[in-house]
Amino acid sequence: MKRCLAVLLALALAGCSSSGGPAGKNSTSAPPLVIHAVDAGTFQEDFNPYHLEGVNFGTSGMIYETLMYFNKLKPGEVVPWLALKYEWSDKGKSLTFTLRPGVKWTDGQPFTADDVAFTFRMLKDHAQLNTSALEIKDAQALAPDKVRVDFRTTSYAKLYNIAGGSPIVPKHLWEKQQDPATFTNVKPVGTGPYKLSKFSAQLYEMEKNPSYWQPGKPEVPLLRFPAYTANALQTALQQGEVDWAGAFVPDIQKIFVQGKPEQNKFFFPPEGVVSLLPNLTNPVLARPEVRQAMSLAIDRDKIVRVAERGYTKVAHPTGVPMPGGEAYVPPEYKDAAFKVDVAKAKELLKGVSPAELKFTLLVPSPFTDWVNAAQLIREDLAKVGITVETRGVAFQDWVSKVGKGDYELSIRGAESGPTPYFQMRFMLFGGLAKPVGEAASGNYERWKDAETDRLIEEYAATDDLAEQQKATQGLGRIMVEKLPQLPLFYSPGWAQFRTTKYVGWPSEQDPYAMPSPYTSPDAAVVLLHLKPAVK
């Protein structure tokens, strides 16, 4: 079977259209844009695009680019980026890309198929960088503008991870690194619209790439990223010091909008699901009845109302994003909803010693909504005899501990993809689980289940939509019946932005990209749409 798709969305390229109001014609004197992408008192100097933390939330898309861009707010939309088209062969085990001509790295070297082949071979040889667990067999340049990547298994379903989630790095620089997995890349060279111009622990800046392959883009000449803690950011937003932020704001009308809705805007599209993660290497949390009792005790409606200020909704028990994911939900669970049942929870825990029901709930201190949610969860679980100590830690510490399995309970989000499968795979695929002490790139609860992995493999082995939906429905049943994670609420893509300097921001009417500055590569797509506001 051979399938070819020439991606014909040239008009959807990020630089070719914009929305949001009138704009000026010349950006030579355009002002810098001040951005807050992640809560941090200090920054760590690490621009390896495969290190999923710190400054790389958002900025990797500005420096390093992928072969294609997938708009999660418009399922099915695939936009040519560093590649113009792709072609499957060998029953989904080989994928050939035709690359965009005339692209250069920011050091002036040409971008070629050798760079793409090197990147995928690097992912094959260094499991720590292969965050999507791609089963790469080999990659080779067929011509300066053509590259083929071969896989050990049918990989139709992984196109998003392959083409949209694998930033391409320059071979001529990265091949000199003995261990690219530990390479911090303090002088990044990419193909993207920006390049790093200044870095300190309190502020880093990025300036426009004058040789970027989209002519005349970007129109924002300079990006500034000051370090703000969550509390400091609230003050900065009130005082107009930040132009674009991605944060939970307790009272957004008072703190940010301030009676100027045309100037101070926000857009919170659903981005995935936030769950309570039980570390399943803990023998007590590995017991299904304990997880079921926890789920029955938690008042999710109150969490959404109090901790999330009503900005989102309680998640469906399958974890499937709703509305929009109905076809991927098992028919028998279409109308399922979480209900609090303290009596039943207590009944389920009768065979468990109270001494065993003591856990620490780890949360990132800067995420004030999650901190508040953790307190509510603690109170709810206490009603059924489960003792929980909530512990807030620095963002980087939380990323490290959850990734390495050094926790008992935690709260974490799972990002959505072109279909619910990608979120479910991230949450449940056994191939992403690592031994405690090794950093995982998903499945942080370390769920290992043969049926789960079989369903994930069935989805990946076909390009038949009905079969893919059937496999995802099976994963939904596992979520409802086995509770490997406890879905809480849908994760909004937090985004606050001002139109005083630039217009063209994403909106509900024009959702051309996720609006959050911490989302890669969407943040770069947003910047490529912006135009100076008319004064």
Where are the model-predicted features located?
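Gly/Pro-rich hinge or "lid" segments in bacterial periplasmic/extracellular proteins
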Residues: 72-73, 164-217, 222, 343, ...
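Long beta-strand-rich cores associated with HINT superfamily self-processing modules
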Residues: 495-535
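Extracytoplasmic/peripheral linker and loop segments enriched in polar/acidic and small residues
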Residues: 338, 389-397, 427-499, 534-535
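Structural transition elements
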Residues: 313-351, 367-370
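N-terminal lobe/hinge region of extracytoplasmic solute-binding protein
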Residues: 36-90, 121, 189-190
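Periplasmic-binding protein-like
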Residues: 256, 281, 285-325, 373, ...
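Surface-exposed binding/hinge segments that line
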Residues: 34, 87, 98, 131-175
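Ligand-site clamp/hinge motif
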Residues: 211-255, 387-389
